[in-house]
Amino acid sequence: MNYFELFKFSPAFDIDTAVLAERYRELQRAVHPDKFANDTEQQRLLSVQRTAQVNDGYQTLKDPIRRAEHMLSLRGIDLSHETTTVKDTAFLMQQMEWREALEDIRDSADPQECIDELYDSFAAYRTKLTKLLTAQLSSDSEEDALLAAVQVRKLKFMAKLHDELTRIEDALLD
């Protein structure tokens, strides 16, 4: 299913999430199972299925990584169950630096400063990746689509690192 069509968007990485939320509410009202409570069993089942599609579409389009994955899947590149690793040497070196920094937080004289620096570093790198991804996804080139898949893989890794940093910060606050 093309969630961009469902929510009446042109396929694009940058979408207005406020408009997305508004269209989500409109679709929810139109297909909500309560609206079909007195209809046939088949109509009620279709309503439940349609509601699930609307919910999944909304969750997909509101999350930038899932949105990018969806755009790529519409172009025949499925990353949803993929285990391919990034082979970019510079990125691998950066990963190692971040991992070392994560390990060093607890022994640091000022753990919060280290955490803040890592959050800033992650944000800067995500911004860089997002700019590349936006340009690559707006292109019709197969090569750019494959490069966009690489950026998505990197962003997925960044999301995991961010979650790990958040867990470390939470543990230090306990």
UniProtKB/Swiss-Prot annotation:
Keyword Chaperone: yes
One GO CC annotation: iron-sulfur cluster transfer complex
Domain J, chain residue ranges per copy: 2-74
Descriptive protein name: Co-chaperone protein HscB homolog
Function statement: Co-chaperone involved in the maturation of iron-sulfur cluster-containing proteins. Seems to help targeting proteins to be folded toward HscA.
Gene: hscB
Organism listed in the record: Shewanella sp. (strain MR-7)
GO biological process, one term: protein folding
PANTHER family: IRON-SULFUR CLUSTER CO-CHAPERONE PROTEIN HSCB
